[in-house]
Regions:
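Ordered core of a single globular domain
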Residues: 222-255, 265-270, 274, 279-361, ...
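Short, hydrophobic beta-strand segments
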Residues: 150-154, 210-219
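Acidic/histidine-enriched segments that form metal/cofactor-coordinating
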Residues: 1-82, 128-138, 151-152, 166-202, ...
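An aromatic/glycine/proline-enriched structural segment found at the starts
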Residues: 50-65, 88, 93-159, 244-267, ...
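Short cationic amphipathic helices and targeting signals
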Residues: 91-99, 213-217, 315-318
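Generic recognition of flexible, low-complexity loop/linker segments
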Residues: 80-84, 138-140, 199-204, 301-307, ...
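Short, flexible turn/loop "capping" segments at secondary-structure junctions
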Residues: 83-90, 143-146, 205-210, 310
Length: 372
């Protein structure tokens, strides 16, 4: 602790150290470019609405930092300003795990961290108006791996104040279900998909929005049936609307969460301390340890409200495939701007296409094999 606390009290921020860090950032950026989901994250930020906070939340590289300097921005001054504005006790959380007594640990913390600058106890929130992405767009991204991925994303309101209800966990459970009568089992039986996962990770949760994602790994034949698959996604959602919420699902998830907490395996202490510090930013103090597992209250109206955001006009479609050139003229979309080569910034190809009619109108009648 004695070594790390120096950074928060009196960081050096030497220019030569910053140059080395720029090289490290660029190396990390280039490594991420070999990962399909890192590419997708870059593309989603790049194609979000100008001026929206999401448009700025992406990895930098040497070029982006050099461009900033060429535009008269002093990076060292900006970093020092960031430190002065945000690195103070009012915004920071500390977790210490050790074998010593609590009195000894508290003494060490007060002695070592007592010189950290004090500041107001505030909770930073980013608020914005308007959608993250334009509606009716399909983005095709050239894949690194030999895969075909259909990635669907819906923008939900911030649900942080409802963390005790774990609403998102209920939706992930139902939409990602793999049993008989599920969306997965139906698409799998048709030979269109290899896997289906519905999720909402912590990195997708902010005061701006929660991003609910469905990641579908496609077969070769499934790549040619993208819009039929999307149609069945909405058929399944329509089946859920009158049937959800069902309290027995919540009770089941509540019991599973309790068992996971009671029988949780011991974590590496570094990871555990880091996770608890992060939880201090998200949960009330009494829920810091249990907050990731808790399903405390049942809210029928809230689930119905959030389901209302699962609409075609609130959906972003990304297709990640190494067969991009073969599929760019698929039914329902026309090329809006052709191929856009962004190698100077990102180093990969993507194509934007505009919708000519909503995918939900291609679905036909509800298929009787889909059940909940």
């Amino acid at each position: 602790m004695g070594t790390s606390v120096t950074f928060f009290v009196s960081p050096l921020m030497r220019s030569e150290a910053m140059e080395r860090e720029v090289q490290a950032i660029d190396s990390e950026f280039n490594t991420h470019l070999q990962d399909d989901f890192s590419r997708l994250g870059q593309l989603q930020g790049h194609t979000s609405s100008p001026g929206h906070p999401f448009n700025r939340f992406s990895c930098g590289n040497k070029k982006s930092l050099d461009d900033a300097k060429d535009n008269g921005i002093n990076l060292q001054e900006r970093i020092l300003k960031l430190y002065r504005d945000y690195y103070h006790g009012g915004l920071m959380k500390l977790v210490v795990i050790g074998g010593e007594s609590l009195n000894v640990l508290e003494h060490w913390v007060l002695e070592l961290f007592g010189d950290v600058k004090k500041g107001p106890q505030v909770k930073l929130e980013f608020k914005t108006e308007g959608p993250i992405w334009k509606a009716g767009r399909l983005y095709r991204l050239e894949a690194v791996d030999d895969v075909h991925i259909l990635h669907l994303a819906w923008t939900l309101p911030c649900l942080q104040e409802h963390y005790l209800k774990k609403l998102e966990g209920c939706l992930c459970h139902v939409l990602g279900h793999e049993g008989r009568g599920s969306l997965y089992s139906y698409l799998k039986a048709r030979g269109w998909i290899r896997s289906l996962d519905a999720s909402l990770s912590r990195i997708d949760c902010s005061s701006v929005a929660y991003i609910f994602c469905m990641v579908i790994y496609l077969t070769d034949s499934g790549l040619e049936k993208i819009f039929e698959i999307i149609g069945f996604v909405y058929q399944y959602i329509e089946l859920l609307r009158p049937m959800l919420p069902q309290e027995w699902i919540f009770r089941e998830l509540h019991d599973v969460g309790n068992m996971k907490f009671i029988f949780a395996e011991e974590q590496d202490q570094d990871d555990y301390a880091s996770g608890l510090a992060e939880n201090l930013l998200c949960y009330a103090t009494q829920h810091v340890i249990y907050g990731d597992y808790v399903n405390e209250s049942w809210d029928k109206e809230l689930i119905e409200y959030v389901l209302g955001f699962f609409r075609p006009e609130n959906m972003r479609i990304d297709v990640i495939s190494n067969s991009l050139f073969k599929t760019k003229g698929q039914l329902g979309y026309v090329v809006l701007c052709g191929w856009t080569h962004t190698c100077k910034v990102f180093g990969f190809y993507f194509c934007v296409q505009v919708q000519t009619h909503p995918p939900s109108k291609q679905t036909g009648k509800l298929y009787s094999g889909l059940t909940v």
